[in-house]
């Protein structure tokens, strides 16, 4: 008998501090950096983003999203077998202890609930779903919490107009459970380390110092060109693996990086933007959190309904990309 990983529920959280484009324009002007609401919107589709408070950690955002997801299912944290957290901005320098372990403790999950982080930047949530799906299909775990959470505001260079206006903080989560009913239909992951320098944090820690820049850097044109190309390819791979055609997809739920990338991908897929869940205008690029944020938004708005076919896809630094086909 086949076992599927079914999406039992979703949840999300955005920090209280919301900065509109104009708020950011005024903040940057104080440091001598010029930009405008029109410049930001035209190039990205972003109108606002949320930043975590000084005392708010990635794990705090993750817990809020996780609690919302659990609440939507009636499943308790004590019932969880596994927690997988996708993040590039962990609570601790060096990435350990894992932020997933911190979340496990804050949620009050049992020590029998395993917990670990996955790092694939903006593709992280698709990677985490693929890992969770494999564990559930193998029969190893029955109830898995998958989270994408980021505090990217802490690695932004506010002297770099090309990046600091694009990113925000947030978290999204899904609860997966073993089911006889179809859920996750296919997963595909890819990586190309030769493209690692076009989107990265170049600094390295050593002997108590950061050698190189501690801020993220991005070659925007190179990222755009590669992203549109690989997203179309991986989307078709996931659909072929799930034995679906593009016209059978009810909703494309893409990584919310840039409206132009989403429009380019939809066009190459032959899909109308009316079938794309778009939330980038509300929170900017939240890296690993963006797909689950968009997914939960679609569920809460009533756009995404049970029985519909969804295609999730994301691409990020590494270079890494992935896609997941789901019957919701």
Swiss-Prot record:
The keyword Lipid metabolism applies. It is an enzyme of class 2 (transferase). GO terms for molecular function: 3-oxoacyl-[acyl-carrier-protein] synthase activity; beta-ketoacyl-acyl-carrier-protein synthase III activity. It is found in: Cytoplasm. It comes from the Bacteria. Coiled coil: none annotated. Residues 256-260 are annotated as: ACP-binding. The active site is at 122, 255, 285. Pathway: Lipid metabolism; fatty acid biosynthesis. Its main location: cytoplasm. GO terms for cellular component: cytoplasm. Keywords: Acyltransferase, Cytoplasm, Fatty acid biosynthesis, Fatty acid metabolism, Lipid biosynthesis, Lipid metabolism, Multifunctional enzyme, Transferase. InterPro entries: ACP_syn_III_C (IPR013747), ACP_syn_III_N (IPR013751), FabH (IPR004655), Thiolase-like (IPR016039). It catalyses: malonyl-[ACP] + acetyl-CoA + H(+) = 3-oxobutanoyl-[ACP] + CO2 + CoA. GO terms for biological process: fatty acid biosynthetic process; secondary metabolite biosynthetic process. The keyword Transport does not apply. Pfam families: ACP_syn_III, ACP_syn_III_C. Its EC number is 2.3.1.180. Homodimer. The last Arg residue of the ACP-binding site is essential for the weak association between ACP/AcpP and FabH. Catalyzes the condensation reaction of fatty acid synthesis by the addition to an acyl acceptor of two carbons from malonyl-ACP. Catalyzes the first condensation reaction which initiates fatty acid synthesis and may therefore play a role in governing the total rate of fatty acid production. Possesses both acetoacetyl-ACP synthase and acetyl transacylase activities. Its substrate specificity determines the biosynthesis of branched-chain and/or straight-chain of fatty acids. Belongs to the thiolase-like superfamily. FabH family. NCBIfam families: fabH, PRK09352.1. This is Beta-ketoacyl-[acyl-carrier-protein] synthase III. It comes from Polynucleobacter necessarius subsp. necessarius (strain STIR1).
């Amino acid at each position: 008998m086949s076992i599927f990983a079914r999406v039992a529920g979703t949840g999300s959280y955005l920090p209280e501090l919301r900065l509109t484009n104009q708020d950011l324009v005024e903040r940057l002007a104080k440091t001598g950096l010029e930009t405008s609401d029109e410049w930001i919107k035209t190039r990205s589709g972003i109108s606002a983003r949320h930043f975590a408070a000084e005392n708010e950690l990635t794990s705090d955002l993750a817990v809020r999203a996780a609690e919302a997801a659990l609440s939507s299912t009636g499943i308790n944290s004590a019932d969880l077998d596994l927690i997988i957290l996708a993040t590039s901005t962990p609570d601790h320098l060096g990435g350990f202890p894992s932020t997933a372990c911190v979340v496990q403790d804050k949620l009050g999950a049992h020590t029998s609930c395993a917990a670990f982080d996955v790092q694939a930047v903006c593709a992280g949530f698709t990677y985490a779903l693929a890992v969770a799906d494999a564990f559930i299909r193998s029969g190893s775990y029955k109830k898995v919490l998958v989270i994408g959470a980021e505090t990217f505001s802490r690695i932004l260079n506010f002297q770099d107009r090309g990046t600091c206006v694009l990113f925000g903080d947030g978290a999204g989560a899904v609860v997966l459970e073993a089911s006889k009913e179809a859920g996750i239909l296919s997963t595909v992951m890819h990586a190309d380390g030769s493209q690692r320098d076009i989107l990265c944090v170049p600094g390295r820690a050593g002997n108590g110092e950061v050698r190189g820049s501690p801020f993220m850097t991005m070659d925007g044109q190179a990222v755009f060109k590669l992203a549109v190309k690989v997203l179309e390819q991986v989307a078709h791979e996931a659909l072929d693996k799930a034995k679906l055609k593009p016209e059978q997809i009810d909703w494309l739920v893409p990584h919310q990086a840039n409206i132009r990338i989403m429009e380019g991908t939809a066009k190459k897929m032959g899909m109308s933007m009316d079938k794309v869940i778009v939330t980038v205008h509300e929170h900017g690029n939240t890296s690993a959190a963006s797909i689950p944020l968009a997914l939960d938004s679609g569920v809460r708005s009533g756009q995404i309904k049970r029985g519909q076919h969804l295609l999730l896809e994301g691409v990020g630094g590494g270079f890494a990309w992935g896609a997941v086909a789901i019957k919701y």
